[in-house]
Amino acid sequence: LLVGNTQSYYASPEDKSYYFIAGDAGSAIAVEYNQENPSLIQLSLKTMGNGKDFLIVPDGGYRNPVSPSSFEMRDFEDGVRRNNLHLHMNGMEVFSFAISNVPKAFKELITYFNIEKANIDYLLLHQANKFFCEKIRKKMGFDIEKTPYNIQEFGNTSGTSVPLLMVTNMHKQLSERKLNILFTGFGVGLSLGVGYMKIENLIIPELLYY
């Protein structure tokens, strides 16, 4: 499973609300089927399309192809300047979506699959924003020791943020122990995914910087 994103290319240097946390990264995960543990991962995916305009690059696709006007810089609130090839984010709407829907989706997953919350070793959150993540963690009732962060080092790396978190903050634990992990990603759509996995003795290469 290959995932990669160069978010810094989509962030306007004149958008102080996002530019400085946009991170670039890629991940590669080899997934192997195990007959002894066919239910290795449980997932729940949701999309709420009425929030599509809250996190979007307006131009560059089939609906709105690139045109000369795509490059025109425009002024937005709080001194932000960007064009229609830059990421546009309504921070308050994305925040509201995340803190309202991610904990709810986790609780539904835990109930549906009869997961014992006391047996969960780690809660891995998409590293969108430390403030977002802390709100979700507290709503979920998890200790800070079970909820690692690396956004202070790498920023928001989009779909690679959870694999990056595993490599940088949990390398030893994942290599040596059997772990029960809750994880989530959320963003463009607006969409979210939550999951639960049982993993042990992973082979994890060292992080490569570029």
Residue spans of the language-model regions?
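Phosphate-binding/catalytic loop of phosphoryl-transfer enzymes
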Residues: 1-19, 24-29, 189-191
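Acyl-CoA/ACP chain-elongation machinery
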Residues: 3-4, 49-54, 130
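Short, surface-exposed connector motifs at secondary-structure boundaries
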Residues: 114-119
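Short glycine-/acidic-enriched loop or helix-start segments at secondary-structure transitions
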Residues: 10-13, 52, 134-135, 192-193
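Claisen-condensing/thiolase-fold acyl-transfer catalytic domains that form or cleave C-C bonds
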Residues: 99, 103-106, 121-210
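Acidic, glycine-rich active-site loops and adjacent beta-strand->loop/helix elements
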Residues: 3-9, 46-48, 153-155, 185-190
